[in-house]
Amino acid sequence: MQSSTSTDQHVLHHMDPHRFTSQIPTATSSQLRRRNSTNQGLTDMINKSIARNTISGTGIPTGGINKNKRTRSTVAGGTNGTALALNDKSNSRNSVSRLSINQLGSLQQHLSNRDPRPLRDKNFQSAIQEEIYDYLKKNKFDIETNHPISIKFLKQPTQKGFIIIFKWLYLRLDPGYGFTKSIENEIYQILKNLRYPFLESINKSQISAVGGSNWHKFLGMLHWMVRTNIKLDMCLNKVDRSLINQNTQEITILSQPLKTLDEQDQRQERYELMVEKLLIDYFTESYKSFLKLEDNYEPSMQELKLGFEKFVHIINTDIANLQTQNDNLYEKYQEVMKISQKIKTTREKWKALKSDSNKYENYVNAMKQKSQEWPGKLEKMKSECELKEEEIKALQSNISELHKILRKKGISTEQFELQNQEREKLTRELDKINIQSDKLTSSIKSRKLEAEGIFKSLLDTLRQYDSSIQNLTRSRSQLGHNVNDSSLKINISENLLDRDFHEGISYEQLFPKGSGINESIKKSILKLNDEIQERIKTIEKDNITLEKDIKNLKHDINEKTQINEKLELELSEANSKFELSKQENERLLVAQRIEIEKMEKKINDSNLLMKTKISDAEELVTSTELKLEELKVDLNRKRYKLHQQVIHVIDITSKFKINIQSSLENSENELGNVIEELRNLEFETEHNVTN
């Protein structure tokens, strides 16, 4: 009894009363009336155990106090002692009655409420409602289901809305599941399959009407499903990231440059593995679509094409890397050669620097010797500065004397200032005149520069003309046509601008008589053109004869091509024979691969059997865990019943003890009366004898 009360008190001390205020069951008046007798017995039992184990009000154990010690010495004293004990019991009963009721309530709560979440608490409900609302809104629940969602709806739900939310959340966990029309019957089985840890708090009859007093249970169930969905999304994101990282790692490894032949072999194996992986993924995706009764295999084919494009890109990058490696090695070789040349030059520079360092050392030594002479020079300079300061003082005194002399003569400083102002005006006018003259000279220079530029451009065009004529004469001389280029040249003196032409240069001044463009050069160019046309006609006649020869050569080529075609037919027949032999070899390889695939299927089947056995074992473990929990619950119930039986026995024994004590007191009173009567009789007999 003492151990059970101590465990109950321990549990009560470790509970947070502010967290579970809404979960404490409040007893009704009928229940209090029904439990009145049991509560009285329980309080008596607790009071007696406290009186036995501790001193009242202190908590000191009474192991060292003699329990059999009595305070009464006479019958009257005995009645007073029992009355005091009864008064103490009645006083302590009121102080401990609330503790015993709270212990009963906590024990009943521990047995009945298996869900540790404070689902009845309004603050907790609002928190999980906000979390459910945020998850549904984030994942576009209202768009996918065409059903509005709000916090108010989660506080006052409908049966239809609950079913829509439940279906949406479960389909995110199991997208291939098909719901029937009577979903209320399926919800319980789905929760059982999901292993909802607080399934015992939900009945099948409550699922048909979730919006009543049991809504807090279903709200907690929806919150649990939201949490599982969040965890599943996190796991899937991790898997996707790992796959992406794996692919990127393979691509980065394959894009790295090669160093040894072993790395080349490893890369070849990775290429083969990549191709096998692409084909396996294509087969699995197409098989999944086949199981789903879908005839559209284009997405998987597109993925296969993209995969092969990436594979080709990787191979191209590998080729490019090899090319870059070769280029880099060649560049390194060139750099090494340059470095060797630099080493030679640096050696020569080192020798030169060594000689320079010797010169600098000599210079430093000379400067050290000169630095020893500088203190004397500085003293001389100080003495000279003192002399100059004395001269400045003398000049200042002279200036003051001159001012005095001018004042005596009547000449003021204002006259000097006026003359200085006139002087400044004259200097300004001179500056303006100089600026205008500079502008005129600059304009003349700019015009002269423009004329020089025009003349230079003319000379450049003449040079281009001369170079084109030289090229023409060379090309014509190569063709066997000699051209006199002296008659086609234009001669202009380059010292033409040195003369002073204030009114410009005329055409006659540029080109003297007999050497102008229209007079002599144009005629010679037309004559040369006529000669070229005559030569073209003769060349065309020669070309006609050459074309006839070419036709004869083409006829010979056609005959030889026919011979080549016959040889190619023979070669194609040989290739067809080779391909037939190759196909037979491939057929044998395919048969061997089929046998390998059969063995792999057997291995996969054995793996599946192992997985099913493992899952069955896990289910057995979970079922045994559930049975263990049920046994624990039954054990707690039996413990509670035994607790009540012990309380009942203690109540009966306490009543029996009280009755015995009252009967003993009555018998003691009767014995006292009898003894007094006997004493009176003895006294009377003695008195009679004496008389």
Swiss-Prot record:
Any single Gene Ontology cellular-component annotation: Ndc80 complex
Comp. bias intervals (Low complexity): 54-65
Biological role stated in the UniProt entry: Acts as a component of the essential kinetochore-associated NDC80 complex, which is involved in chromosome segregation and spindle checkpoint activity.
Name under which the protein is recorded: Kinetochore protein NDC80
InterPro entries: DUF5595, Kinetochore_Ndc80, Ndc80_CH, Ndc80_sf
One Pfam match: DUF5595
Gene that this sequence comes from: NDC80
Residue ranges of coiled coil: 376-446, 522-686
Residue positions where Phosphothreonine is found in the record: T38, T248
UniProtKB keywords: Cell cycle, Cell division, Centromere, Chromosome, Coiled coil, Kinetochore, Mitosis, Nucleus, Phosphoprotein
Subunit details: Component of the NDC80 complex, which consists of NDC80, NUF2, SPC24 and SPC25. The NDC80 complex is formed by two subcomplexes, NDC80-NUF2 and SPC24-SPC25, which are joined end-to-end through their coiled-coil domains. It has a rod-like structure with a length of 570 Angstroms and globular domains at either end. The NDC80-NUF2 globular domains are probably directed to microtubules, the SPC24-SPC25 globular domains to the centromere. NDC80 probably interacts with SMC1 and SMC2. Also interacts with KIN3. Interacts with DMC1.
Regions of compositional bias (Basic and acidic residues) in chain numbering: 10-19
UniProt-listed GO biological process terms: attachment of mitotic spindle microtubules to kinetochore; cell division; chromosome segregation; mitotic sister chromatid biorientation; protein localization to kinetochore
